[in-house]
UniProtKB/Swiss-Prot annotation:
Disulfide bonds: none
Record organism: Chlamydia trachomatis serovar D (strain ATCC VR-885 / DSM 19411 / UW-3/Cx)
InterPro entries: MYG1_exonuclease
Protein name listed in UniProt: MYG1 protein CT_386
Top-rank taxon: Bacteria
Coiled-coil features, chain-numbered ranges: none
Annotated family: Belongs to the MYG1 family.
């Protein structure tokens, strides 16, 4: 007889794929954390409603998600299998599925299946989960597994919150793109850059974006593409590079000048008025107005 809301996974050293798979099932209220069974005993696994990363079977109908058997020829690990399962059940929209997959789960699949290895100096999510394992192999790893599980749940929760926030921002960005040509003006800080390019920003004429931040205003150059995000379509004047306060005031002739990044892609102003003045100055120098 199966234990409702239970999930079985292998014991011993753990990896990001089964940790992520369990975290996803918990997040969507399909299993209980206190009903995670870590074992390789087939009889105990048979009692679990879900089984991840062990058991030699992949069947969404029977809620079995293992990828190690020869009969499975796909590219997923147990994490990708469970994410796809949740999508199929309607827990995730297509957009949210793509977001979670592209942001986290695909990387877990790639690393677990040996198709990706982190370069020196870089630490992936899978690397972090691996570090949660005990330093010495052998013995009980349940305590460390649950530490890693809670970390994964927290990260996935934050990613879902960010996805929802980004979708709200996307609507605002779309509205501003429809009415502005040279500069996208926002009345608050928001996630504009990725949304701008996902909405066709590469062909949009805007070269700048402005928005308030704390008690100041940001004027930033827009990149030509998302992949070239540290470049800008129109840079600030070279003589502004790296200047602060009075130095920038003297260089620009604008009393509200605070800072210009040495990369000439971002500047800070004390008010919306001084920010607009800076924008107009740059546009005049570029003979765009």
């Amino acid at each position: 007889m199966q234990i409702p809301r239970s999930v079985g996974t292998h014991d011993g050293s753990f990896h990001a794929d089964e940790v992520t798979a369990c975290a996803l099932l918990i997040m969507f209220d399909l299993v209980d954390e206190n009903k995670i069974v870590r074992t390789r005993d087939p009889q105990k696994l048979a009692q679990c409603e879900y089984v991840c990363d062990v058991g030699g079977r992949y069947s969404t109908e029977h809620k079995r998600f293992d990828h190690h058997q020869v009969s499975y020829t796909g590219s997923w690990s147990s994490a990708g299998m469970v994410l796809d399962y949740l999508h199929g059940l309607g827990f995730l929209s297509h957009d949210e599925y793509e977001y979670l997959n592209n942001t986290l789960v695909h990387g877990v699949d790639e690393q677990d299946n040996g198709r990706f290895f982190s370069k020196e100096g870089f630490c992936s999510f899978s690397d972090i989960i691996k570090i949660y394992n005990p330093l010495e192999e052998g013995g009980n790893t349940d305590k460390e597994f649950f530490f890693a599980l809670r970390f994964a749940i927290d990260l996935l929760t934050r990613l879902r919150e960010k996805f929802c926030y980004d979708r709200v921002c996307r609507d605002i960005v779309k509205q501003v793109m429809e009415k502005e040509s040279v500069c996208l003006r926002f009345d608050r800080p928001l996630a504009w850059q990725e949304n701008f390019f996902s909405l066709g920003g590469e062909s949009h004429p805007a070269a700048f974006v402005s928005f308030p931040c704390s008690d100041q205003w940001i004027l930033r150059g827009i990149p030509p593409t998302l992949d070239r995000r540290m470049e800008v379509r129109i840079p600030f004047p070279e003589e502004w590079a790296g200047l602060l306060g009075d130095q920038l005031v003297q260089a620009t002739g604008i009393p509200g000048a605070i800072f210009c990044h040495k990369g000439l892609f971002l500047s800070v102003w004390d008010s919306q008025e001084s920010c607009e003045e800076a924008l107009n100055l740059v546009l005049k120098q570029q003979r765009l107005v």
